[in-house]
Structure formats: C-alpha cells, structure tokens
Amino acid sequence: MQITRSSAEGTNATTKGPAEWFTGDVYIDPVAASPAPSRVLANLVHFTPGARTAWHSHPLGQSLFVTEGIGLCQRRGGPIEVIRPGDRVYIEPHEEHWHGATPGRLMVHLALNEVDDEHVAAHWGEHVTDDEYNGAGTDTSQE
C-alpha cells in the first residue's frame, strides 16, 4: 500500500494547464498516477468560464465524471453536448474530441484514462476555434 499525502506544494499541487493544450484558464489537481504495471491516470480538472481543451484523442479512451458547473463536449463531426454534475462521458479510443466550460459557467470534471505501452495518455491537436466552441451559432451562453 502506498499513501500519497495531500500537500500545498510538491507532486500533487494544483498546476495550471499548459497553453498548448487549453484555451483559457484551466487548473489540474492530480488524483492518481499509479506506478507500473498500472496504467491509470486520474485528474480533477477545473475549467473557468469559456475555457476548454484543444482537440485531442486518447489511445486507450477516456472517462469523464462532471462534479461541478456546466460544461460542453464534442466529438469531431458531432453536435456539441451540454454536460452537468453527475453526467458521465466515455470517449472511445482515438476519438477526437474536446471538452470545457460553457461561456458563463465554470465546470469541474474527474478525468480518468490510461497510458499506452509508450506511456502516452493523449495526442494533442489544434485549438478549438471560437466558431467551433460557439457551435457556429448554437447558443450555449445560458447553460
């Protein structure tokens, strides 16, 4: 058994999400990064209003569990979906997608995924444009 104690500094401190992966302010609290042979990664991800991921995919898929606020998610070519606390989202392996907060509300989710044999958890693509985020006219501002 291994216990990792919570601390204000160190390996489980909150970090700001990198600009290469996110638009807007996103903060990440690591929950689990289990040592091999486990492949599990878990992060509590905090999106400020309007913040979102870039397009990306996961070699082994991803599960999201919304804990606070109201969010948006979309798979490439699909409609923008509104997600709320208690909602669970499963993203298929290699499915391009993005997720984030609505323009007027924050959103927090628990992100669960695994690393592949090369220790890769995600493949990052281009940023989601404002037109893509706004659904080319879809009104998500009241969500």
Feature-to-residue mapping (PLM):
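Short beta-strand His + acidic residue motifs that chelate non-heme Fe in jelly-roll/DSBH
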Residues: 53-56, 73-74, 91, 96-103
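Short, conserved beta-strand element in jelly-roll/cupin
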Residues: 44-48, 57-73, 112-115
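Conserved short histidine dyad/triad with adjacent acidic residue
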Residues: 27-30, 43-58, 93
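A short, N-terminal "cap"/entry segment at the start of jelly-roll beta-barrel domains
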Residues: 1-39, 121-143
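Short acidic-glycine-tyrosine-enriched beta hairpin
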Residues: 77-94
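A short hydrophobic beta-strand segment most commonly corresponding to one strand
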Residues: 63, 90, 104-123
